[in-house]
């Protein structure tokens, strides 16, 4: 059966789409106009699909006209895969390929320094292989851990600002009668240095009170020693027996060595402490196993000692002394002394340290600048730092007098 001629012509007719029927044809460039094209935009055209590098000794397939590097396509055919890597068209052998020197000339025109480009690629690969391997990663991790440990040790040993005025508050660890304490050390920069260790008695000159609350004892002894009173030195030595914690029973094991030191800033509570009251920011450095009760009692002792020092400074002299050196405006005698010698009236009682307790002050913390949280007295500072603070700067605590200490 023969097919009509018009049917054969109709099968060879190219049917145009609606877009192709209405689009405007582009005008051919007939003059010497040049168009700038970046080499990066030609990268996909100049790249071998097998090695993904620039074509070298280009070979073109005769069937599908795809281009490959000569070494790449020959290796692919020898591996037994007799088809085009791009379109899977049948390739019998190397006879299905032909060299394409025109394309090589085009590449050499675009990249005249091909050897320099390849040398640069080799240097980049060598550098990557040297830096990006398991050994380099391990050495980098070890170096980072070593640097972190070194900086952490420096941060622990770094002195606080004003460390030349730092004093140590420590409980004695010797015989039970010499000085009782837990062994924690708390430093504050609000008074001059004092040597740690209790002293049974101080000379009349006062000096620094070697005590667990060394700053207060020393200041009180020094203030009263200037007036020549014998009992001021005794008080300076007696204050040296103050401790931060309950006394250790005889024969009890010594406390463990502190695991680390913690720096903290002690501020008065901005809401609960009135501006007229005694309030002072304190910078303290202590061991991590000190508890909140230790800080409360330390604070109560310090404030009591400093108030006692203030009272002794305002009212100098002592029982049995001579004429007071604090004369009135009219040249008369002092407030407590009797001019002409003789025994003066009894000195007013100074604030007692026997009733000092950790219940007198409450410690607060404001994690993240939020609401204030009351700290339990049994919490250690290390636990407080891990639970509430979690930042790499000194722990900030607030204190306020307890409303109903019991």
From Swiss-Prot:
Gene3D superfamilies, sorted: Phosphatidylinositol 3-kinase Catalytic Subunit, Chain A, domain 1, Zinc/RING finger domain, C3HC4 (zinc finger)
InterPro entries documented for this protein: RAWUL (IPR032443), RING1/RING2 (IPR043540), RING1_RING-HC (IPR042741), Znf_RING (IPR001841), Znf_RING/FYVE/PHD (IPR013083), Znf_RING_CS (IPR017907)
One MF annotation (Gene Ontology) recorded for this entry: ubiquitin-protein transferase activator activity
Coiled-coil portions: none
Protein name, as recorded: E3 ubiquitin-protein ligase RING1
Gene Ontology CC entries for this record: nuclear body; nuclear speck; nucleus; PcG protein complex; PRC1 complex; sex chromatin; ubiquitin ligase complex
Its EC number(s): 2.3.2.27
Class of the enzyme per the UniProt entry, highest EC level: transferase
Motif mapping: Nuclear localization signal: 201-204
Residue spans of biased composition, Acidic residues class: 175-187
Residue ranges, compositional bias (Pro residues): 246-258
Pathway: Protein modification; protein ubiquitination
Cross-referenced SUPFAM superfamilies: RING/U-box
Keywords: Chromatin regulator, Metal-binding, Nucleus, Phosphoprotein, Repressor, Transcription, Transcription regulation, Transferase, Ubl conjugation pathway, Zinc, Zinc-finger
Zinc finger (RING-type): 48-88
Cellular localization per UniProt: Nucleus speckle
Modified residues (Phosphothreonine): 24, 215
A single GO BP: protein ubiquitination
Keyword Cell cycle attached: no
Assembly, per entry: Component of chromatin-associated Polycomb (PcG) complexes. Part of the E2F6.com-1 complex in G0 phase composed of E2F6, MGA, MAX, TFDP1, CBX3, BAT8, EUHMTASE1, RING1, RNF2/RING2 MBLR, L3MBTL2 and YAF2. Interacts with CBX2 and PCGF6. Component of a PRC1-like complex. Component of repressive BCOR complex containing Polycomb group subcomplex at least composed of RYBP, PCGF1, BCOR and RNF2/RING2. Interacts with BMI1, PHC2, PCGF2, RNF2; CBX6, CBX7 and CBX8. Interacts with MN1. Interacts with USP26.
Region (Necessary for interaction with CBX2): 230-406
């Amino acid at each position: 059966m023969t097919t009509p001629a018009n049917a054969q012509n109709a099968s060879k007719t190219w049917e145009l789409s609606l877009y192709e029927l209405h689009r405007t044809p582009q005008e051919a460039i007939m003059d010497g106009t040049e168009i700038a094209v970046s080499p990066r935009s030609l990268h996909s055209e100049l790249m071998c699909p097998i090695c993904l590098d620039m074509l070298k000794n280009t070979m073109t397939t005769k069937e599908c006209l795809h281009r490959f590097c000569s070494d790449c396509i020959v290796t692919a055919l020898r591996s037994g895969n007799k088809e085009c890597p791009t379109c899977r068209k049948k390739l019998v052998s190397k006879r299905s390929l032909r060299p394409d020197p025109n394309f090589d000339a085009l590449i050499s025109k675009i990249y005249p320094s091909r050897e320099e480009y390849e040398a640069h690629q080799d240097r980049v690969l060598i550098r990557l292989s040297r830096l990006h391997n398991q050994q380099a990663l391990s050495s980098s991790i070890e170096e980072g851990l070593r640097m972190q440990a070194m900086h952490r040790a420096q941060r622990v040993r770094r002195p606080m600002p004003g460390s030349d005025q730092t004093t140590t508050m420590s409980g004695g660890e010797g015989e039970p009668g010499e000085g009782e304490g837990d062994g924690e050390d708390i430093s504050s920069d609000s008074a001059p240095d004092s040597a740690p260790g209790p002293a049974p008695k101080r000379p009349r000159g006062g000096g620094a009170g070697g005590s667990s609350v060394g700053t207060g004892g020393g200041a009180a002894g020094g203030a009263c020693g200037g007036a020549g009173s014998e009992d001021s030195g005794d008080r300076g030595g007696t204050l040296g027996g103050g401790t931060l914690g309950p006394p250790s029973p005889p024969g009890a094991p010594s406390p463990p060595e502190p695991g680390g030191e913690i720096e903290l800033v002690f501020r008065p509570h901005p809401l609960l402490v009135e501006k007229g009251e005694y309030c002072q920011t304190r910078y303290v450095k202590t061991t991590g196993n000190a508890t909140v009760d230790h800080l409360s009692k330390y604070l109560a002792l310090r404030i009591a000692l400093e108030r006692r020092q203030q009272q002794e400074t305002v009212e100098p002299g002592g029982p049995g002394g001579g004429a007071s050196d604090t004369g009135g405006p009219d040249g008369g005698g002092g407030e407590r002394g009797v001019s002409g010698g003789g025994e003066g009236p009894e000195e007013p009682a100074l604030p007692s340290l026997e009733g000092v307790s950790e219940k007198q002050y409450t410690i607060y913390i404001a994690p993240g600048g939020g609401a204030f949280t009351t700290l339990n007295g049994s919490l250690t500072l290390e636990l407080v730092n891990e639970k509430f603070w979690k930042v790499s700067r000194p722990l900030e605590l607030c204190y306020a007098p307890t409303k109903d200490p019991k």
